[in-house]
């Protein structure tokens, strides 16, 4: 199966230019292709995964991927289908983000061997270009009429009170020139990107043909949608980042574990490197079993292993199992740090707090009276163990102090998992 056929079977092609010619070229020879990543934050998020993984798929088929980090274009920001003007970031901020994104792209691609991946930064050519050269050598090849007819530009112009600045209007010229420059430097003949990049990609194709009389191609990947209409890649806590310091491996694992049945088989095709035959077999087995599908677990394992590695996957599974177990002794200090980052609602507490106060503070009970009822009915656990009276000498006027949280409840001298019922948790972080 060719790489184009594989992408088609996974539903990963939204638009292409001359797909028959592209497929023939890919079957006849090994090519160089690229995808651009503008630094708009200090980390990539799962919305970037499709193009990153597409580069990897092409490399596995023997082609040379180029990861282009937009050190220059990131100073402006892509206006494509954005409702309003982007805020501009300082050169120092963008430079820091460039380095972060470069390091995050590295694990996905192999930078050794015959088709070693290439890392590029468009600041290398735009940083040396002056305004007159840009207007004379690049601008003359672009039609303002054609630019105004791009759907992404028309939407901004037609939106009341919006409009578009010349800075953002000129963005497609910069991205278009990236293609021409990478064609000249590295022989790139294919640009891939998200479906919102079609206008920018075709601008680069046109410019490269005009400058170098080369046939080059574009391919876009689909917008990832969820069956319930909500935005993919967002949780109540915000974006799901690839950086473990922004989204913990545990939370990352949980995100994939919670994918709806209606989406999970599509996402297995989109995001994993399991074969279509393997995915179809998983779906058939799930539908025949009549019990809880295995697909979500497989998806969560594949994605967490791919992004964070085997150790992080093991930690995510350990945390997931321990939260609902009586024995939580297997949790490491690093596991608790993940929970404190984003795994559980975390609350700072001080010595002397009792379990009733802790339940109210964390919102696991709405009042002291309700909290006492939970404690008396044995519905409250501390690190997996039932909360029990441990302070027989408490003051008569403070009956709730019969169960004080103390050193025996502190894991690593800092953490206590408070649980009410089967699924309601909070993490106490001791000052």
Curated annotation (Swiss-Prot):
Transmembrane segments: none
Record has Transcription as a keyword: no
Motif annotated as 'HIGH' region, chain positions: 39-48
Binding site for ATP: 234
Top-rank lineage group of the source organism: Bacteria
One biological process term in Gene Ontology: tyrosyl-tRNA aminoacylation
Enzyme Commission number(s) from the entry: 6.1.1.1
Residues of the S4 RNA-binding domain: 353-422
GO molecular function: ATP binding; RNA binding; tyrosine-tRNA ligase activity
Keywords: Aminoacyl-tRNA synthetase, ATP-binding, Cytoplasm, Ligase, Nucleotide-binding, Protein biosynthesis, RNA-binding
Motif annotated as 'KMSKS' region, chain positions: 231-235
Binding residues for L-tyrosine: 34, 171, 175
Predominant place of localization: cytoplasm
Classification via InterPro entries: aa-tRNA-synth_I_CS (IPR001412), aa-tRNA-synth_Ic (IPR002305), Rossmann-like_a/b/a_fold (IPR014729), S4_RNA-bd_sf (IPR036986), SYY-like_C (IPR054608), Tyr-tRNA-ligase (IPR002307), Tyr-tRNA-ligase_bac-type (IPR024088), Tyr-tRNA-ligase_bac_1 (IPR024107)
Catalytic activity annotation: tRNA(Tyr) + L-tyrosine + ATP = L-tyrosyl-tRNA(Tyr) + AMP + diphosphate + H(+)
Keyword RNA-binding tagged: yes
GO cellular component terms, A-Z: cytosol
Cell compartments where the protein resides: Cytoplasm
PANTHER family found in the cross-reference section: TYROSINE--TRNA LIGASE, MITOCHONDRIAL, TYROSYL-TRNA SYNTHETASE
Quaternary structure and interacting proteins, as annotated: Homodimer.
Function: Catalyzes the attachment of tyrosine to tRNA(Tyr) in a two-step reaction: tyrosine is first activated by ATP to form Tyr-AMP and then transferred to the acceptor end of tRNA(Tyr).
NCBIfam families tied to this protein: tyrS
Family designation: Belongs to the class-I aminoacyl-tRNA synthetase family. TyrS type 1 subfamily.
Name under which the protein is recorded: Tyrosine--tRNA ligase
Species lineage: Bacteria, Pseudomonadati, Pseudomonadota, Betaproteobacteria, Neisseriales
């Amino acid at each position: 199966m060719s790489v184009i056929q594989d992408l088609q079977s996974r539903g990963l092609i939204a638009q292409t230019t001359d797909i028959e010619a592209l497929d023939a070229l890919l079957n006849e020879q090994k090519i160089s292709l690229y995808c651009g990543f503008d630094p708009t934050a200090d980390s990539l998020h799962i919305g970037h995964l499709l193009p990153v993984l597409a580069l990897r798929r092409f490399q596995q088929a023997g082609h040379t991927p180029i990861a282009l980090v937009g050190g220059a274009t990131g100073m402006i920001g892509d206006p494509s289908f954005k409702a309003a003007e982007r805020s501009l970031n300082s050169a120092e901020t963008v430079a820091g983000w460039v380095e972060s994104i470069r390091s995050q792209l590295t694990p996905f691609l192999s930078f050794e061997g015959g088709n070693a991946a290439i890392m590029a930064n468009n600041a290398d050519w735009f940083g040396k270009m002056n305004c007159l050269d840009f207007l004379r050598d690049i601008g003359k090849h672009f039609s303002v009429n054609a630019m105004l007819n791009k759907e992404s530009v028309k939407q901004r112009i037609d939106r009341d009170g919006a409009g578009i600045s010349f800075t953002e209007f000129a963005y497609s010229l910069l991205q278009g020139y990236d293609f021409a420059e990478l064609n000249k430097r590295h022989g790139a003949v294919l640009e891939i990107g998200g479906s919102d990049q079609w206008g920018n990609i075709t601008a680069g194709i046109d410019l490269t043909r005009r400058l170098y009389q080369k046939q080059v191609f574009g391919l876009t990947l689909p917008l990832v949608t969820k069956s319930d209409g909500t935005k993919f890649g967002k949780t109540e806590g915000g974006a799901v980042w690839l950086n473990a310091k922004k989204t913990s491996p545990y939370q990352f694992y949980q995100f994939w574990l919670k994918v709806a049945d209606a989406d999970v088989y599509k996402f297995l095709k989109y995001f994993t490197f399991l074969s279509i035959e393997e995915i179809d077999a998983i779906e058939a087995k799930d539908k025949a079993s009549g019990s809880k599908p295995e697909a979500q677990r497989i998806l969560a394992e594949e994605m967490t292993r791919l992004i964070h590695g085997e150790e992080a996957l093991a930690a995510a599974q350990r945390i997931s199992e321990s939260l609902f177990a009586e024995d939580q002794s297997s949790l490491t200090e690093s596991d608790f740090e993940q929970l404190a980052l984003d795994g559980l609602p975390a609350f700072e507490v001080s010595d002397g707090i009792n379990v009733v106060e802790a339940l109210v503070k964390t919102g696991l009970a709405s009042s002291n009276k309700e909290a006492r009822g939970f404690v008396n009915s044995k519905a409250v656990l501390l690190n997996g163990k039932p909360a029990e009276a441990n302070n027989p000498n408490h003051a008569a006027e403070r009956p709730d102090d019969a169960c004080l949280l103390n050193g025996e409840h502190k894991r690593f001298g800092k953490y206590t998992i408070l649980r009410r019922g089967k699924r309601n948790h909070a993490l106490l972080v001791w000052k």
